[in-house]
A protein has these predicted regions:
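Residue-level recognition of oxygen-bearing side chains
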Residues: 1, 5, 67, 91, ...
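Alpha-helical transmembrane segments and their short interhelical loops
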Residues: 2-72, 133-153
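Transmembrane helix-bundle signature of multi-pass membrane transporters/permeases
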Residues: 4-5, 9, 77, 100-104
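Small-residue-rich segments of transmembrane alpha-helices in multi-pass membrane proteins
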Residues: 73-82
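Short hydrophobic, aromatic-rich alpha-helical segments embedded in or entering the lipid bilayer
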Residues: 81, 86-126, 136
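Junction motif at the cytosolic side of a transmembrane helix
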Residues: 116, 120-123, 129-163
Length: 163
């Protein structure tokens, strides 16, 4: 299982490189220095690594690969669209603003914006702990996700292998 997630990590590096190059070609220019930009890509890599464990558990829990793809989409879709990734949260109803505020995707997006030297436009909940500390919150979320999903995935894998 660890080999699979490390393989996903290699694929994520290729994807991050392609995204960075594509962004640069279309006009994205980070305003921070090379160290901060590298940290931003490292941060994205680590978040992807943590989330790959969610995918591993989903993949082990279902019997069919198409079901695994759909189940992963069902898990990721709300997290992405209930975040500040595509638009500020100010247009959301108040209850959804608070969901978006504490969403791991929102803190990751805000943290990466800071690392790349871009303005952190967190949205309507600016001034809250997640909006003021997106890097710290992202690290906390990554640790929690891995602390939950690595043992569950390994256990599920071992149970399946022992059948």
């Amino acid at each position: 299982v660890f080999g699979r997630t490390l393989g996903d990590g290699v694929l994520n590096i290729v994807v991050l490189a392609a995204m960075g190059i594509t962004g640069f070609v279309v006009g994205w220019r980070p305003s921070s220095g090379p160290v901060m930009i590298t940290l931003g890509f490292l941060f994205l890599f680590l978040f992807g690594f943590a989330m790959s464990w969610v995918g591993v558990l989903i993949g082990l829990a279902v019997k069919d690969e198409r079901v695994a793809q759909n189940a992963t989409f069902i898990a990721v879709f709300p997290l992405t669209f209930l975040s500040n990734a595509f638009a500020p949260t100010t247009g959301m109803p108040k209850p959804l603003q608070y969901v978006a505020e504490w969403n791991p995707v929102s803190t990751m997006v805000a943290g990466c914006r800071e690392l790349f030297g871009l303005k952190n436009e967190f949205g309507a909940t600016a001034g809250s702990f997640p909006s003021d500390n997106p890097l710290l919150m992202s690290i906390i979320y990554m640790v929690i996700i891995m602390a939950i999903f690595i043992p569950l995935s390994v256990r599920k894998y071992n149970n399946a292998a022992n059948k």
